[in-house]
UniProtKB/Swiss-Prot annotation:
SUPFAM superfamilies: RING/U-box
Organism name: Orgyia pseudotsugata multicapsid polyhedrosis virus
UniProt-recorded name of the protein: Zinc finger protein CG30
Molecular function as annotated in GO: zinc ion binding
InterPro entries assigned: Znf_C3HC4_RING-type, Znf_RING, Znf_RING/FYVE/PHD, Znf_RING_CS
Superkingdom of origin organism: Viruses
Gene coding for it: CG30
Length: 249
């Protein structure tokens, strides 16, 4: 992507960022949209200043989420380094006001005159052999670095896939073990219920036999008493018979 356009969600102003990847000279880029430090929502510095001016506690209330922010982040890109500046909302000041639209190039020329290049940069398509070699060298180095990164990512992805596969195998085994355990629990529960029913049946049978045994004991006692009475009566009968025989002439 050669150009990226960023828009402030409050004032709808647009900032354009060009890709200087193919430029032989290192370029410094300050991202035009800032990031609120607490809630991470983005807007432009002018909106930060205007919103902060309406408050009384030197903090800006985010228009998107209403969270208070005392700082905001500004991102700077230089070569292969991305730096972030944590700025205080209370320190934002309006530098000046113009009758029309402000000319950023003229403002930079006036404010940073000691940092101006003596010669204008060459047009985009007027690369010399040395510049082209430098660009190709950079491209080759970045391609090699990206290739190494891709290889490392591929190794990590392979290891991750293997780990996921092993985890899935363990999960499948755990599910099988859990299913077997559930089946065994069901079988044990069935055995316990059957054993409980058998014990209850035995208890009922024992109660029935105990009742019958008690009845038989009572009947045996009654018969024993009757037998004793009969024996006593028989003995008396024999005694009376013997006495009568003695008395008879």
């Amino acid at each position: 992507m050669d150009t990226v356009r960023l828009q402030c969600h409050i004032c709808c102003s647009v900032g354009e960022i060009k890709n200087y990847f193919l430029q032989p000279v290192d370029a410094i880029t300050i991202l035009p949209i800032v990031e609120l430090h607490t809630c991470r929502h983005q807007l432009c510095v002018m909106c930060v200043r205007k919103i902060a001016q309406r408050g009384r506690d030197k903090r800006v209330e985010c228009p998107m989420c209403r969270r208070k922010n005392a700082h905001f982040n500004v991102y700077s890109v230089n070569r292969n380094s991305v730096d972030v500046l944590r700025c205080s909302v209370a320190d934002v000041r309006e530098h000046g006001r113009f009758g029309g639209l402000a000319d950023a190039a003229s403002l930079a020329r006036g404010l940073f005159e000691p940092s101006l290049l003596e010669a204008e940069p060459a047009p985009d398509n007027s690369f010399g052999p040395n510049e082209l070699q430098l660009v190709l060298k950079r491209l080759k180095a970045q391609i090699e670095a990206q290739t190494r990164t891709n290889y490392d990512l591929q190794l990590q992805a392979t290891a991750l896939e293997r780990t996921i596969e092993e985890a899935n195998d363990r999960l499948g085994k755990s599910r099988g073990d859990y299913s077997d355990a559930c089946k065994l629990m069901d079988e044990l529960r069935g055995d316990r219920l059957r054993a409980e029913r058998a014990v209850k049946a035995l208890a009922d049978a024992h109660a029935q036999w105990a009742d019958k045994n008690a009845k038989m004991r009572r009947e045996n006692d009654r018969l024993t008493n009757e037998n004793i009475g009969l024996i006593r009566d028989n003995n008396l009968f024999k005694q009376n018979t013997a006495r009568k025989r003695k008395i008879a002439p």
